[in-house]
């Protein structure tokens, strides 16, 4: 298949926005794969701020970062992503160039603990305040469960209503696949 799958495309988008020395955000740590990916890009002079409400996600991400010798490039926060403005350093405004959200539940974790539309939208709004122009927020939306469908609808409504003078919004996904395949909403700050 020549078309890029959803998760590789999410990384392609992040690679176009995030450079060495930048700040990036992994708004849903999960098992730390995206955190490590971003930490490799930002290098020793940048920083990745990772958020998760689940202790096991913090632990898994810490282990993965240490195994790859990237732990010093990350700040892991055991709290909701909607607290990011209170966590980011004062010099973050204009230095955050990329952020990723994997909306849904922790792979292999408790499927009753899911991301919520209100905190997700609040975090997006906060990111748009501090992001550099042309910074990109990537939301990978898993909507194969009831809460995921509610969050999908809320995030799409929010994104569709963003002023085009503030941001460009892209939706990317395969529309003829079964079982509610994940799709991307990417928001590029203008």
Map each language-model feature to its residues.
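Mobile active-site "lid"/loop adjacent to the S-adenosyl-L-methionine
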Residues: 101-122
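S-adenosyl-L-methionine
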Residues: 1-23, 27, 36, 40, 58-95
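Conserved beta-strand signature within the Rossmann-like core of class I S-adenosyl-L-methionine
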Residues: 28, 130-141
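Helix-to-beta-strand junctions that scaffold the AdoMet/dcAdoMet cofactor pocket
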Residues: 19, 42-43, 131-133
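A short glycine-rich, Lys/Arg-flanked "PGG" loop and its adjoining helix->strand segment in the class I
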Residues: 119-133
